Each structure stands twice: as structure tokens, then as C-alpha cells.
Amino acid sequence: MFIAMDNNQKRWNCMEEIPAVTEGPFYCLACHSPVRLKNGSVLRAHFAHVKLQHCPYHHEAESFEHLELKASLYDWASKESHTEVESYLADFQQIADLLVVDKNLALEVQCSPLSLERLKERSDAYRANGYQVYWLLGKKLWLKERLTKLQAG
């Protein structure tokens, strides 16, 4: 995740400003569990749960591909429109990877398999709350020789 908050409720966005470790401790915006700043040489700076099992919104660690796609989309969309990354939508308890606020548009990056039921549930929730949603698929989910169950829908 790219967004976390500190003890003073300040939101930190690692794509805009990488905080010093001394600015922490940091917490997940959704579950308020501790997260740590990771700023190594392989992955771009991001936050990760200290213990992931406590967060109902982040079920697994985000892959390199997921982080990079989300960051690239944010860089692109934020040039033209007010865009928020990892925006928590309290009305239906969903975290949008990217939310283009002035267009009521949610952009979701999906790099790992997702059941058709869960995809429909999340898409329906966005639409019921006035958002248009686009799902952008990582390479593992691209169409190969035949349709997967999810693609056949």
C-alpha cells in the first residue's frame, strides 16, 4: 500500500513524499493496524502490514506488478484529474486502488485470480454507489489460448 497515517492522523502517500522512518509509527487507514515503511532497492517505497491477518481490506501482500501498475496509473490519471490512491469508501467498505474523484471513476488493478462472484460483488457495489469501475488486469490474467472461467463470465 502507498498510503498510511501517523500518530497525528497525517496521511502519508509514498508516491508523493517518502517519510523518514522517524516520522512513524505508521498505521493502515482501513484497519488501524501497524504498518512499516519499506524503502529498499527492489520495490518502490510502500507500506506493509506488520501482521497482515488483522486487516479485512488487504488480504495479501501486493506484488511488484500490482504496485507498479497502480503507481503508473496514478501518475497518468493525476495529471488530468483529482485522483486519490487507496481511497477508502466507507459507504460500502471498499478501498479503491485509484479513485478519479471528479469523474466518479474507480480503477482497480487485479494481478491475482479473483472469483467471478467477488468481482461481481465489488463491481455492483461501485455501481450502486454511483461509480463507474474499470478492472485493469496484470499479465498473469491476460487472455491466452482460451477463455478462463472469469473471462468467459
Predicted feature residues:
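N-terminal cysteine/histidine-rich coordination modules
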Residues: 1-76
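Catalytic cores of nucleic-acid endonucleases
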Residues: 96, 111-153
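Short, contiguous strand/loop micro-motifs
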Residues: 60-61, 107-110
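Active-site metal-binding core of divalent-cation-utilizing nuclease and nuclease-like domains
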Residues: 16-20, 37, 72-106, 114
